Each structure stands twice: as C-alpha cells, then as structure tokens.
Amino acid sequence: MRKTIVIVGASRGIGKELVKILSRDENNSIVALARNTASLAEFNHLANVEIHAFDLNTDAVRTSAETIFQHVSNIDILINNAGKLVNKPFLELSKEDLEESYQVNVIGVMETVQAAIPKMLEVGGHIVNISSMGGFQGTVKFAGLAAYSTSKAAVASFTELLAEEYKDTKIKVNCLCLGSAQTEMLEEAFPGFQAPVSANQMAVYIADFSLNAHQWMHGRIIPVSLTTP
C-alpha cells in the first residue's frame, strides 16, 4: 500500500538520511520539507520524492504547510525532525535566541501538526515528534543548552497532550528522545565529540519506528540513547 510520508527538517543529518532510507521503497511517496532545499538536489531524479522549501522560523508555518499538503490526498506519516540549537551560557541568551528556539522547536511543530491532522483523520496516520534526551525528565542536563533542552521537553509534553486529545481517532502520536548521533547539531553542541551512533543508524531506527510502532503504542515518550552525549 502506498504511503505518503512527510519529513520536516530533511536537509541534513538524520532528516536527510530518512529521505534516503524511506525513498528506497517505491511505494512510499516522500514529501521532504527543508529550509535549505539545495542540499536535497540529489533526490530530484526520484519520482517518489517531492521537495519543498519550508521554514519553521516564520509567522506563516501553518499556512505554508497547508499549501504544501493540499496537493496530497492524505498523510500517513509525519516526522517532525527539524530543530534549532543554541549553545550559550544562560545569562547570554537573548530574547531572540529564546523566541527562535521555541518557534522552531515547539510552535512550528505544533502548527505543522495542525496543518497535517485534517489529512490524517479519515484514514489514520502516525505523528512522530523528534525530541532529545536533553528534554527527557530525569536525565543528565548540560550547561549552555537551556533554550534547546527546555523546548525539547515541551515537545514531549505536547506529544502526550495531543495523544490524549486524539485518542478516539485513527491518529497515533509518539515522541522519540534521541541521544548522541553523529550529526551537525551534535557538533554544534559538543564540538569534537564522537557519537557511538551515526546519523544513518539513527535514521534506520526512526524509519522503522515511524512505519510500524503506531500499531502498538500511542502517546509514548521513548528515550533512544546509548550516551548523552
């Protein structure tokens, strides 16, 4: 059965690996959303991948997403993978740092979901929100990541609330809190650190989870980590 899979934050790291992995199945129709679409040029020749410019750091996220989604009959899977990381001491965080972190990591995610839900209600779908171990309660926290980690904690809370609101529908919602994977974002947070898991390895797990986990779980906040970092 053909599946329409929307991947937000597809231009690099885990998101780009997800496009590679999920597009190998010709029955998957991939909608890749990214602020920087140039890095996705290698997928232009694939008939089952469509690429759209999409910026979460704007006031028009919901309307932009609705415009993109109007071209698909339904959405089977939405993977909210995009993220903004600011690594600064707490007292050096500007209001702009805080607003952008929450706009990209929380508000933009919620508005994207608002646009996607009408495309899921009839046949059902799986929303996978990507959070971080930094936002998972009770784990080790790191100085300099106050804006990032608190916003990712909000993503986990949003997942639980959304799951409750839509528990009587065909929509399933889950959240993966990722530990260290070798990505550009990890390098920004912990320069020089070598993660035990590659972006591709993490993407393989997320792809399988996105395709299958909705069959037996809903509203789950799941740590996916060997190290933090």
How would you label these PLM feature ranges?
Residues 11, 19:
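N-terminal Rossmann NAD(P)H-binding glycine-rich loop of SDR-like oxidoreductase domains
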Residues 89-90, 97-99:
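Substrate-binding pocket helix/loop in short-chain dehydrogenase/reductase
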Residues 81-86:
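Conserved NAD(P)H cofactor-binding loop of Rossmann-fold oxidoreductase domains
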Residues 140, 161-171:
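Active-site-adjacent segment of SDR/Rossmann-fold oxidoreductases
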Residues 168, 175-176, 191-229:
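C-terminal helical subdomain
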Residues 132:
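Residue(s) in the substrate-gating loop at a strand-loop-helix junction
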Residues 113, 148-151:
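Active-site helix of classical SDR
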